[in-house]
Amino acid sequence: METTMGFMDDNATNTSTSFLSVLNPHGAHATSFPFNFSYSDYDMPLDEDEDVTNSRTFFAAKIVIGMALVGIMLVCGIGNFIFIAALVRYKKLRNLTNLLIANLAISDFLVAIVCCPFEMDYYVVRQLSWEHGHVLCTSVNYLRTVSLYVSTNALLAIAIDRYLAIVHPLRPRMKCQTATGLIALVWTVSILIAIPSAYFTTETVLVIVKSQEKIFCGQIWPVDQQLYYKSYFLFIFGIEFVGPVVTMTLCYARISRELWFKAVPGFQTEQIRKRLRCRRKTVLVLMCILTAYVLCWAPFYGFTIVRDFFPTVFVKEKHYLTAFYIVECIAMSNSMINTLCFVTVKNDTVKYFKKIMLLHWKASYNGGKSSADLDLKTIGMPATEEVDCIRLK
């Protein structure tokens, strides 16, 4: 379940009227749910005599998001596990670029195995109702938000690393301690800036139609703190989308000029040409990942800005729910694209993982191989061209 946000006053007697609302047909207060990093599950026009969650449109949307969640659990769960296992097992894969990619893999893996099952229950099984308590509500939303920021910051770090390695090759590469500090910074920044989303996340029981209740799980900011919320959202929009996208675009534009439009001085040996091809392939993959990131998350942020800053656009919009799920699924699919690109395209982690399984199967079958024998075999495995490619020294 994505992080959501609404505004409610401290006395629960009235709420902001400048945002879309979910109205209690029995005369209770209206609760507004424009929210921060996702789309308000209840922020849709509801008929007093009809439960929207029982409509045909909602049923179709439920199938779509269910398929997306299953895809994330399978692709990100299995794919990132393979990448992490291969990285742990083989030292040959532990270069700076792969260590940065591992941050994406870990965050996406945690979301796939921890968050997605709860999201499946929330969106598909219980039709927008949370039944797992306040602690899990806060934890799942917080983990999902941190994962998004880790992915963004890691992609930015990878772009800067590629820029320094290719445009300024004579500068010394990042040392192990510096790389460790960079990885720690990626997680620390992501954890800290997501704290407000956890602080304001709570459960709220809503009466949707007649006596039917739905338990909303998401961010609810006090009505007198709307300005703080908008400022916080614009801050996040700037440092976690606009800033990284502009920086990565400039980095890859300069890298492209260096690799494709600048003549290499001197005689080009086959080794130099091979290295150039490898670098071009890696940069193309990274630029495709950047493009996918923009295409997936730009609708997400655009939808949120329209909903939170121009709420009248969605007033009485019958297809709001459909639009919500379309944008939701597009944003969620970005983690699958990253996994497919990094695991199946960028390197040979799948091949290495197969060799791990094969060696352990042979050891179990023969019964006489020690773990030391396996270590000698795996450490002595030759590096493939693709592994050499991703080193980019």
UniProtKB/Swiss-Prot annotation:
Cytoplasmic compartment spans: 84-98, 168-180, 254-282, 344-393
Extracellular membrane side: 1-62, 120-146, 202-232, 304-322
Tissue specificity comment: Localizes to glandular epithelium, stroma and vascular endothelial cells of first trimester decidua (at protein level). Up-regulated in first trimester decidua when compared with non-pregnant endometrium. Expressed in the stomach, throughout the small intestine, colon, rectum, thyroid gland, pituitary gland, salivary gland, adrenal gland, testis, ovary, brain, spleen, prostate and pancreas.
GO biological process, one term: G protein-coupled receptor signaling pathway
Gene Ontology molecular function: any one: G protein-coupled receptor activity
Disulfide bonds: C137-C217
Spans through the membrane: 63-83, 99-119, 147-167, 181-201, 233-253, 283-303, 323-343
Entry keyword set: Cell membrane, Disulfide bond, G-protein coupled receptor, Glycoprotein, Membrane, Receptor, Transducer, Transmembrane, Transmembrane helix
Glycosites: N11, N14, N36
Key word Transmembrane helix present: yes
CDD domains in UniProt: 7tmA_prokineticin-R (cd15204)
Membrane topology listed for this record: Multi-pass membrane protein
GO cellular component: plasma membrane
Tagged with keyword Cell membrane: yes
Pfam families: 7tm_1 (PF00001)
Superkingdom in the source lineage: Eukaryota
Compartments in which it is found: Cell membrane
Family the entry assigns: Belongs to the G-protein coupled receptor 1 family.
Function: Receptor for prokineticin 1. Exclusively coupled to the G(q) subclass of heteromeric G proteins. Activation leads to mobilization of calcium, stimulation of phosphoinositide turnover and activation of p44/p42 mitogen-activated protein kinase. May play a role during early pregnancy.
Name of the featured protein: Prokineticin receptor 1
Taxon lineage: Eukaryota, Metazoa, Chordata, Craniata, Vertebrata
